[in-house]
UniProtKB/Swiss-Prot annotation:
Keywords: Magnesium, Manganese, Menaquinone biosynthesis, Metal-binding, Thiamine pyrophosphate, Transferase. Homodimer. It catalyses: isochorismate + 2-oxoglutarate + H(+) = 5-enolpyruvoyl-6-hydroxy-2-succinyl-cyclohex-3-ene-1-carboxylate + CO2. PANTHER family: 2-SUCCINYL-5-ENOLPYRUVYL-6-HYDROXY-3-CYCLOHEXENE-1-CARBOXYLATE SYNTHASE, PROTEIN PHYLLO, CHLOROPLASTIC. One of its GO terms (molecular function) is magnesium ion binding. Belongs to the TPP enzyme family. MenD subfamily. Pathway: Quinol/quinone metabolism; 1,4-dihydroxy-2-naphthoate biosynthesis; 1,4-dihydroxy-2-naphthoate from chorismate: step 2/7; Quinol/quinone metabolism; menaquinone biosynthesis. This is 2-succinyl-5-enolpyruvyl-6-hydroxy-3-cyclohexene-1-carboxylate synthase. Catalyzes the thiamine diphosphate-dependent decarboxylation of 2-oxoglutarate and the subsequent addition of the resulting succinic semialdehyde-thiamine pyrophosphate anion to isochorismate to yield 2-succinyl-5-enolpyruvyl-6-hydroxy-3-cyclohexene-1-carboxylate (SEPHCHC). InterPro entries: DHS-like_NAD/FAD-binding_dom, MenaQ_synth_MenD, MenD_middle, THDP-binding, Thiamin_PyroP_enz_TPP-bd_dom, TPP_enzyme_TPP-bd. GO terms for biological process: menaquinone biosynthetic process. Pfam families: TPP_enzyme_C (PF02775), TPP_enzyme_M_2 (PF16582), TPP_enzyme_N (PF02776).
Length: 572
């Protein structure tokens, strides 16, 4: 039953807003402290149906909520105070929009009369996130002249739009003072009475009908099956959906080229080392016999695969992805189907199992032998290769070198239960906070693989890990700066590369781990790494839920190793 007594009209509207969010399925709220957001915070604290997640840094807060939403697959609300606190959510909002993650931003704001007049902690928050929210609404200051149903109806409409186009939505809530309760609560039963049965039910005010996802059968599907095709698997969040893709490739007899984000990167049906094998002319020549491309999920990590797709003269190229966005950076698509893989497979049957048309697995074997040889010592390559064999539970992979190395080097095997990344905007900020949020979605352990600059960007969020209720292992690749730039054609004269790109910092993370109460290891051999990682997943070290394993390597080593490996594969 919805309460009739509240502190102020601000609190009535805040309670209505959060109650309707709960009735529409929201269960997690991320909160940072602040005064202007007091009505929202108090309503969230009083509601027994929410799991509340706290962080003192709004930038990390946004990314934590992003991880919670990615892990749970459900919308997550985020509450923050006014001013630059709101602006700090910008990176997480951009990432959420680009990857279709449902965040609900509830920003507190000054009332209109305190905007643009020199009032403290007041900025123009209307439309602050630009075009990145899929829907945004500026709620007026609460007043008895606006019916309570307006608040409920607004929530219903915005979340219906979010269901149609997954991504962030933004409610800007303009609260005048008073923001806190007085000596006694007031009775608002007269104001709430027009809501009728809603006050005593658990149903939303005006739920919108959602259409079931159906993928119409393409009339030329039968003809496409008869061609030499390949299946590329990009970002697929649901492992069950990914298995549909692997089974479809198997029935068609088409090679499967699966990205790290596909949930089937470690599947034996995948050409597991295709990225590095694309440097070999025999492998490329065999792959180039393909006539058509069927891709599930976008945002590929492998630049070499992206270049092959861009340059190959496809007879046809279809992309299946549930996000209703243009995902065609090279303008090569000929068919765009907005649905999940299972919906596509339900209407696009493969009547008979086809024999493979290719010998790509055979062509890949020599590259695989070179990879295993290059990964047999303690290095970034060696650690990432060994991690692929050791990993238990979930994997969150940071951007820059970690994502590329895991995409290149992983072996076929059990692999992680789920893989998650932030590959929308592909920033190196907020990765620790996102991984923490992602870890909260599962009782399984979560491993975060991250670089040193990414860790420095989000050092505040180590505070989240110190209070984690889930086992989490951080593997931190410390090559003293931005070593990925050594892979790019940056001029090396006059120390330009070192001074302006790699930015060596000379820092290590043992004291950071101690400050935030994390267990710390710094192995120097692959055997020590394996022992440290397996121990971090077991008791008694789980009494400290999080272990930080720092991998200290020379700055130029990873670039030199990859260049040598590439040369060896090209020479096969």
């Amino acid at each position: 039953m919805f309460a009739s007594q509240h502190a102020t009209f601000n609190h009535v509207w805040s309670s209505l807003l959060l109650e309707e969010l709960h009735r529409l399925g929201v269960r997690d709220i991320a909160l940072a402290s602040g005064s202007r957001s007091a009505p929202l915070t108090m309503a969230a604290a009083a509601h027994a149906g929410f799991r509340r997640h706290l962080h003192f840094d709004e930038r990390g807060l946004g990314f934590m909520a992003l991880g919670l939403a990615k892990g749970s697959g459900r919308p997550v609300a985020v509450i923050m105070t006014s001013g630059t606190a709101v602006a700090n959510l910008w990176p997480a909002v951009a990432e959420a929009q680009l990857t279709g993650v449902p965040l609900i931003i509830l920003s507190a704001d000054r009332p209109p009369e305190l905007i643009d007049n020199g009032a403290n902690q007041a900025i123009d928050q209307q439309g602050i996130f630009g075009r990145y929210p899929v829907y945004q609404q500026n709620l007026p200051s609460p007043t008895p002249t606006i019916p309570a149903a307006f608040v409920l109806s607004s929530v219903d409409q915005v979340l219906a739009q979010q269901a149609l186009t997954p991504g962030p939505v933004h409610f800007n809530c303009m609260y005048p003072e008073p923001l806190y309760p007085g000596d006694e609560y007031l009775d608002f039963s007269g104001y709430l009475a027009p809501l009728g049965d809603w006050l005593h039910s658990s149903e939303p005010w005006s739920p919108w009908q959602q259409n079931e996802q159906i993928c119409p059968r393409q009339p030329d599907w039968a003809a496409l099956q008869g061609k030499r095709g390949i299946i590329v698997a990009g970002r697929i969040q649901d492992p069950a959906q990914a298995q549909v893709v692997a089974e479809l490739a198997e029935r068609l007899g088409w090679p499967l080229l699966a990205d790290l984000q596909s949930q089937i990167r470690f599947d034996a049906r995948n050409l597991i080392h295709m990225d590095l094998a694309l440097q070999n002319s025999c492998f490329v020549a065999e792959l180039a016999r393909a006539e058509v491309l069927l891709q599930f999920g976008a945002r590929l990590i492998s630049k070499r695969l992206g270049q092959f797709i861009k340059q190959h003269p496809w007879q046809d190229y279809w992309l299946v992805d549930p996000q209703p966005a243009r995902l065609d950076p090279d303008y090569r698509l000929r068919r765009r189907l907005v649905c999940e893989p299972a919906a596509f497979a339900a209407t696009h049957k493969v009547s008979t199992r086809h024999l493979p048309w290719h010998r790509l697995a055979e062509r890949q074997q020599s590259a695989t032998r070179q990879i295993r040889s290059a990964c047999d010592r303690f290095s970034e390559l060696g650690v990432c290769h060994r991690l692929g064999n050791l990993i238990q539970g979930q994997l969150f992979v940071g951007n820059s070198m970690p994502a590329r190395l895991m995409d290149m080097l992983g072996e076929a095997g059990k692999g992680p239960s789920r893989v998650m990344t932030n590959r929308g905007a592909s920033g190196i900020d907020g990765l620790i906070a996102t991984a923490y949020g992602f870890a909260q979605s599962s009782e399984q352990p979560t491993t975060l693989l991250i670089g040193d600059l990414s860790a420095l960007h989000d050092l505040n969020s180590l505070a989240l890990l110190g209070k984690s209720s889930r086992p989490l292992v951080v593997i931190l690749l410390n090559n003293d700066g931005g070593s990925i730039f050594r892979m790019l054609p940056v001029p090396t004269g006059d120390r330009l590369l070192e001074t302006y790109y790699c930015l060596p910092h000379g820092l290590h993370f043992e004291h950071a781990a101690a400050m935030f109460g994390l267990h710390y290891r710094a192995p120097t051999t692959l055997a020590e790494f394996e022992q440290a990682y397996t121990a971090a997943l077991k008791k008694p070290e789980l009494e400290k839920k999080v272990t930080l394993i720092e991998i200290k390597v020379p700055s130029s080593e990873v670039a030199e190793d990859l260049k040598a490996l590439g040369a060896a594969i090209r020479g096969l």
